[in-house]
A protein has these predicted regions:
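Short intrinsically disordered terminal tails
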Residues: 1, 80-86
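Short, charge-rich amphipathic interface segments used for partner binding and complex assembly
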Residues: 44-82
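N-terminal acidic leader/helix
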Residues: 2-42
Length: 86
């Protein structure tokens, strides 16, 4: 499961940053979920949802939520998926 290895740190002093981190983390978990399903079933729906997550990481909104480079986020998620066999 995706964890804070993407350097999404907790910031209890800034609840808005905490919320932004939670949104980014959930998008990563969603990507993993759909990639796992796509690996198993090869359904277009799962592929398009994966791409939707990738597009989110490159969106202006995601860039407002985190300072982490979207390519770094996606690369770390893909490495974790490969490590787990999907």
């Amino acid at each position: 499961m995706l964890n804070a290895n993407v350097n999404v740190s907790r910031d209890v002093e800034n609840p808005y940053k905490e919320l932004g981190n939670a949104i980014i983390l959930q998008a990563g978990k969603d990507y993993i979920h759909y990639r796992k399903r796509f690996h198993k079933h090869h359904k277009d729906f799962d592929y398009f949802r994966m791409k939707e997550c990738e597009n989110f990481f490159h969106s202006d909104w995601a860039q407002l939520l985190t300072d982490i480079d979207p390519f770094v986020i996606i690369e770390k998620i893909k490495k974790e998926c490969k490590k787990n066999g999907y």
